[in-house]
From Swiss-Prot:
Chain segments annotated as coiled-coil in the UniProt record: none
Subunit annotation: F-type ATPases have 2 components, CF(1) - the catalytic core - and CF(0) - the membrane proton channel. CF(1) has five subunits: alpha(3), beta(3), gamma(1), delta(1), epsilon(1). CF(0) has three main subunits: a(1), b(2) and c(9-12). The alpha and beta chains form an alternating ring which encloses part of the gamma chain. CF(1) is attached to CF(0) by a central stalk formed by the gamma and epsilon chains, while a peripheral stalk is formed by the delta and b chains.
Enzyme class: translocase
Function: Produces ATP from ADP in the presence of a proton gradient across the membrane. The catalytic sites are hosted primarily by the beta subunits.
InterPro entries named among the record's database cross-references: AAA+_ATPase, ATP-synt_VA_C, ATP_synth_F1_bsu, ATPase_a/bsu_AS, ATPase_alpha/beta_chains, ATPase_F1/V1/A1_a/bsu_N, ATPase_F1/V1/A1_a/bsu_N_sf, ATPase_F1/V1/A1_a/bsu_nucl-bd
Family: Belongs to the ATPase alpha/beta chains family.
Annotated positions binding ATP: 148-155
Organism name: Legionella pneumophila subsp. pneumophila (strain Philadelphia 1 / ATCC 33152 / DSM 7513)
UniProt protein name: ATP synthase subunit beta
Length: 458
């Protein structure tokens, strides 16, 4: 393979000069001689010089060092040997459990499946979380986004979904930690270990303290491992926490690569980078990838270019709201803002659809009446509106639920509620069967029977 020389180092971006007749291709991996450091070629600048991003810290790099062209993109181990292991962006183990003797390695840059290979699915994926199953149901092989500002519970929701689906679903999962807290990665590992599902999960981490090159590519590393499981004919779950940090890593290197920034300082290639990742997360005729992605919303502004670009790719959006978190209702899902393509009578059935829409109508009416209540008080409302308000407040509380992964903090055991029980409970509240129960009985319970039992103790 050809040898090049480092000619310039600016932060994470390194320029390497090669002989004119053997210039590396874009996306090829270069390896620093006598070191583990890997670079990925981003641009060819002419005169044999290529501009690269370092997949590791560039501390101590200097001009004149030699780098060799591997002749192929970054290759990572795939297959069953990756299960139960924690890896970095290059597929190297970071859990001190010995090498990963994978039979196969795949390049992290791949083409998305063609039109002929793709397959749609109408099958629902039950999560055991009432508000999600009722109002924004997930499709098997679909893409879901968890949107929320700082501290409204994206990661806790994500961990609960993983726990519920991984245990109930019994397939393989891949978790890509993109620019998140190392503590969360550690908690997550132990959570999986304690739930005895670690041997079904591959973990790929590029945490907050990593250089931008790692955070920019770690999502692709996780996705490549998921694609391998899918191409073996499995239904695989892909969790990405957090898509926003993927965009942010692109912002960090974009200016260093010499690109002009676009709106709000984002990279001009934002839509393309997002599309290249998202289009590969899809189901084929051999197997499916169901993906659940956490999306940080800067300053709670859903119109920011990063979350706005992500919206276009998703089948279901779960919006976590600060106003609902302030009421102490967790999961803090906004029932009026969250949407799903699956909420269609032809897919979920008429009964489920009607219940979900009536829940939303009741909550919407309550929202409209709030101003009147604030100024004139409840007594000025008509009897019909009073009923709507009391039922809406019960629905609001019944949408909360204790989580398994939060047991250590809350002290109350987690609850998994089947879709059948969820629909039955909300139908009962809407029909007025539980008008005599106090609001507090509906707060942080699983099924409606628990609410009835709780009312007796109040």
């Amino acid at each position: 393979m050809s040898l090049g020389t480092v000619v310039e180092v600016i932060g994470a971006v390194v320029d390497v000069e090669f002989p004119r007749d053997s210039v590396p291709k874009v996306n090829d991996a270069l390896k620093l001689v006598d070191s583990d450091l890997v670079f990925e070629v981003q641009q060819q600048l002419g005169d044999g010089v290529v501009r690269t991003i370092a997949m590791g810290t560039t501390d101590g790099l200097k001009r004149g060092l030699k780098a060799e062209n591997t002749g192929h993109p970054i290759q990572v181990p795939v297959g069953k040997k990756t299960l139960g292991r924690i890896m970095d962006v290059l597929g190297r183990p970071v859990d001190d459990a010995g090498p990963i003797d994978a039979e196969e390695t795949w390049a992290i840059h791949r083409k998305a499946p063609s039109y002929e290979e793709q397959a749609g699915s109408q099958e629902l994926l039950e999560t055991g979380i009432k508000v999600i199953d009722l109002l924004c149901p997930f499709a098997k092989g679909g893409k879901v986004g968890l949107f929320g500002g700082a501290g409204v519970g994206k990661t806790v929701n994500m961990m609960e979904l993983i726990r519920n689906i991984a245990i109930e679903h019994s397939g393989y999962s891949v978790f890509a930690g993109v620019g998140e807290r190392t503590r969360e990665g550690n908690d997550f590992y132990h959570e999986m270990k304690d739930s005895n599902v670690l041997d079904k999960v591959s973990l790929v981490y590029g945490q907050m303290n990593e250089p931008p090159g790692n955070r920019l590519r770690v999502a692709l590393t996780g996705l490549t491992m998921a694609e391998k499981f899918r191409d073996e004919g499995r239904d695989v779950l892909l969790f990405i926490d957090n898509i926003y940090r993927y965009t942010l890593a692109g912002v960090e290197v974009s200016a260093l690569l010499g690109r002009m920034p676009s709106a709000v300082g984002y990279q001009p290639t934002l839509a393309e980078e997002m599309g290249m990742l998202q289009e590969r997360i899809t189901s084929t005729k051999t197997g499916s990838i169901t993906s659940i992605q956490a999306v940080y919303v800067p300053a709670d502004d859903l119109t920011d270019p990063s979350p706005a670009t992500t919206f276009a790719h998703l089948d279901a959006t779960v919006v976590l709201s600060r106003q609902i978190a302030e009421l102490g209702i967790y999961p803090a899902v906004d029932p009026l803002d969250s949407t799903s393509r699956q909420l269609d009578p032809l897919i979920v059935g008429q009964e489920h659809y009607d219940t979900a829409r009536r829940v939303q109508q009741t909550l919407q009416r309550y929202k409209e009446l709030k101003d009147i209540i604030a100024i004139l008080g409840m007594d000025e409302l008509s009897e019909e509106d009073k009923r709507v308000v009391t039922r809406a407040r019960k629905i609001q509380r019944f949408l909360s639920q204790p989580f398994f992964v939060a047991e250590v903090f809350t002290g109350s055991p987690g609850k998994y509620v089947s879709l059948k029980d969820t629909i039955k409970g909300f139908q009962g509240i809407l029909a007025g069967e539980y008008d005599d129960l106090p609001e507090q009985a509906f707060y942080m319970v699983g099924s409606i029977e628990e609410a009835v039992a709780k009312a007796k103790t109040l």
